[in-house]
Regions:
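Structural signal for hydrophobic packing residues in well-ordered secondary-structure cores
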Residues: 1-5, 66-69, 80-98, 119-126, ...
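Function-dense linear segments that define catalytic or interfacial modules
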Residues: 4-105, 115-125, 229-232, 236-264
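Acidic, glycine-rich active-site loops and adjacent beta-strand->loop/helix elements
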Residues: 17-19, 142-145, 172, 299-301, ...
Length: 357
């Protein structure tokens, strides 16, 4: 924990949660590790050499739904169908230089569909990370996402057949994430299920699923720029984000700043990690892989500006208690100014090289 606090880069995976609350039957397909950003939890097997057909390299094909464009949860039905069908087709077109990677990708057909613009979505709906007001909305939203993703994959299985290793999933056994989630979540959110899961369960039992997994919440640090969206599920650090790359610097303003500036909850305005972690746990109730979630600390909130180990351990135990599978960065506020002169900065952001037509 000291190393995580000082570097921010000791990442945490609760492997027991990754197997007990998994898309896979842990007796047949054990989860042993994750990827760099910690949203992927897929089975792997060691290989003796690059041509070893008995090994398994996990591959997951990703996409994200822009929650900022969602006005009605029924909109997610068509979006989920398009996402599942598009990503499933990509699996056939990709080049696989390693045989045990191709075997995994084609036989499991694992997808990881996440979200971007969650902070904007909360602001639009006038709810916040820290005070519990976003819990029910988050529950309803991620229930709809997982339901429609599974429905789309089941319909695709009806057309093309289920993935060849579908029998290694919990879905094959009739066990869904809503059956295996950590029940401590019920103590923080009592929102009921709203969709017809029993009917979907019967259809999946009959037709199977085209894909072993459907959901994973990735950081979307770079890809969110294309849609001028806030990163993944994260609160923005400021109304203006400055992102650097090999192509230069990009200044990005949160969506609908002038209309919603009083509704956004910025990262360092959030008093502690608990409200955020509770929302992550509610998402994890439905997500069948994992979530790239962070913890954040402002030293100025603590005595002598030193974050006590007691606080770090407490947050870790809260995450574990609520069934959170993985924790990515530990961010510590470094004193840099997050909010520039907003009115002046926003006026000066122009598309200097943009031509019409």
């Amino acid at each position: 924990m000291r190393e995580r606090a000082s570097t921010g880069r000791i990442y945490i995976q609760h492997v027991d949660h990754c197997n007990s609350h998994s898309a896979f039957n842990s007796k047949l397909a054990t989860i042993r590790q994750s990827n760099l950003c910690l949203e992927i939890t897929l089975p792997t097997k060691p290989l003796n050499n690059i041509d070893d057909k008995n090994g398994e390299i996990a591959l997951c094909t990703l996409s994200a739904l822009n929650l900022g464009l969602i006005n009605d949860l029924h909109d997610l039905k068509e979006l989920s169908t398009l996402s599942v069908r598009a990503l499933d087709e990509i699996l056939e077109y990709q080049n696989y230089p390693v045989v045990c990677a191709k075997k995994s990708a084609i036989s499991r057909r694992s997808l990881g569909i996440g979200v971007i613009n969650f902070a904007y979505y909360l602001a639009k709906n006038k709810v916040r990370y820290s005070d519990g007001s976003a819990k029910n909305l988050t529950h309803k939203t991620f229930e709809a996402i997982q339901y429609y993703l599974l429905k789309a994959s089941c319909e695709l299985a009806k057309e093309k057949g289920s993935c060849s290793l579908f029998n290694q999933t919990n879905y094959y056994l009739g066990k869904f994430p809503i059956d295996t989630y950590k029940k401590d979540i019920d103590s923080i959110c009592n929102e009921p299920l709203h969709l017809n899961w029993n009917l979907l369960r019967k259809k999946i039992k009959k037709y199977g699923l085209r894909n072993s997994t459907l959901s994973a919440l990735m950081p979307s640090e770079t890809s969110s720029q294309i849609s001028n969206a806030t990163n993944g599920i994260e609160p923005p650090r400021g109304f203006i984000s400055i992102k650097s790359s090999k192509d230069g610097m990009l200044r990005q303003v949160v969506p609908e700043y002038k209309k919603l500036k009083s509704e956004y909850e910025l990262l360092w305005e959030i008093p502690n990690n608990i409200g955020y972690l509770e929302l992550v746990a509610i998402m994890q109730k439905f997500v069948d892989q994992s979530i790239s979630a962070n913890t954040n600390y402002d030293p100025k909130r603590f005595l002598n500006e030193k974050i006590p180990m007691k606080q770090l351990i407490y947050d870790l135990l809260v995450a574990y208690k609520l069934g959170i599978k993985t924790l990515y960065y530990q961010n510590t506020r470094d004193g840099a100014e997050d909010n520039q002169n907003l009115n002046k900065s926003i006026e000066n952001i122009k598309e200097d090289n943009c031509t019409s037509g």
